[in-house]
Amino acid sequence: MSTEQTSADQTSTEHSTQQPTAQPGRPEVAAAGEWTFPEPRVRELPNGLTALVLDVPGQYVTSVRLTLPLPLRAEPRELEGVAWVMAGLLDEGTQQHDQRELSEMLERLGVGIGAGMSEGSLGVDLDVPQRHLGEALTLMTEIVREPAFAPGEVTRAVRTRLQDIEQERASAPHRAMRQLAATYYDPQTRASRPGAGSAQSVAAITRDDVVAFHREHVHPHGGTVVVAGDLTDVDVDVLLEASLGSWTTPGPAQEWERVPAPRAQDAARVVLVDRPGSVQSELILATSGPDRRAPRWPAFPVLGYVIGGAPNARIDAVLREEKGYTYGIRSGFRPRQVGGTFVVSGSVRADATVDSLRLLDEILRGVADGVTPVEATSGVDFMTLTAPGRYATADALADELAHLAADGLPLTFTSDTVAAMRRLTPEDLDAAWREDVGTDWTVVVVGDASAYRDEVEALGIGPVSVVPA
């Protein structure tokens, strides 16, 4: 044996007998700490507006949210859609500045502004760099107090809305939602009709109608303005009093009570919206659910996540991952001012329509058998551990505060809900589903009805009817 070989063998033996170097242990991941939604400073302005002011250091774009009580049911039946037309025209010129001048002023200040309607309120959203907050609030006040509603702008807004209605009719998801509202709700309630109006009612809207609706229904009293951002060296109270706090209207504001939207007596049925030749089907299933005042409300966002809020939730685990019928179907609770709905929606391959409905029926009925501990933990963790990220920016904080104001909920609601979620058990989730979620479903399918009507009837999930697209 050569000297080199002997040396190599000795070296190999030495290496093989050496003890491995100890590796430092991995750092332990600490449990997430308690999180609470920041509480704003509350101030009442002279004209009846409530101001919620939230200092968010480091957020140099300031978010302002103005929420005024104004339900859609305030619209005359023959002019439904006038509220949305009015809201969309607020930033299209004022009595002091025409549309072009106003646009240039907003652009120079870096202001983003928009307005829209919800079930119970008019909302005006504004975002602006902190240094221009005072000027932006002055313009916001001008916009809500004295919009011009120029005849040409009103005509354009009405035409645009009519075009949107045609486009929505061609969109399967929009068509499905419109049919769901018409089928689910009592035909006498406002919720059964399109929130932004029908083609017939929108076409009837004139400038005089828009002016009259604004004059009668847009008042500061009872409203809320939220200001959130880095407010270092900013005297928000002075800015608000000089702007929105100085806004007054001649007439008294009407007091609006929260009222339920009754369900139709024949809502538990299947409606096939016929679109011949469709290669996929849009599905929507809905039943009754709670509003955010329900004692068990913290359980429902978790249930929505477990059932259909993620790719690994019960619905997609079967219809997407196992069957390959869909790119994704989602579910969630949709609270209203009083009561609410639980909605499942998504699209599937046309040839999988019947089996998808069968599987959804099985999955939804199976929730009554109970939520597993793993599912409960997963849902609770997602909803609670992502909360700090969801509310990390000034605009998200302002949005949530505006929603709380619109719903008349306490400022501690979000923190209380997250804290209650952390304590949820599988038994709590089971009780919430059993006690507060309906068992009779409204089902809408948009697709080629001739391809599966008989098979859908054979499923026995409800009486079946067909309507044209």
Question: Predicted segment positions?
Answer:
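M16/MPP (pitrilysin/insulinase) zinc-metallopeptidase core fold and M16-derived inactive scaffolds
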Residues: 63-127, 193-194, 309-325
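Residues that act as N-cap/strand-start positions at coil-to-secondary-structure junctions
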Residues: 36-37, 107, 267, 427
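Short, charged, low-complexity patches
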Residues: 79, 83, 133, 137, ...
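Envelope-exposed proteins and targeting segments
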Residues: 39, 47-49, 60-66, 120-122, ...
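Short, surface-exposed beta-strand/loop micro-motifs that present aromatic residues
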Residues: 41, 50-55, 212-215, 267-274, ...
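Charge-rich, well-structured scaffold segments of protease-associated domains
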Residues: 2-5, 9-24, 44, 101-255, ...
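N- or domain-start disorder-to-order transition segments that initiate the globular core
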Residues: 17-62
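His/Glu-based metal-binding/catalytic segments typifying zinc-dependent metallopeptidases
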Residues: 54-70, 80, 182, 252-312
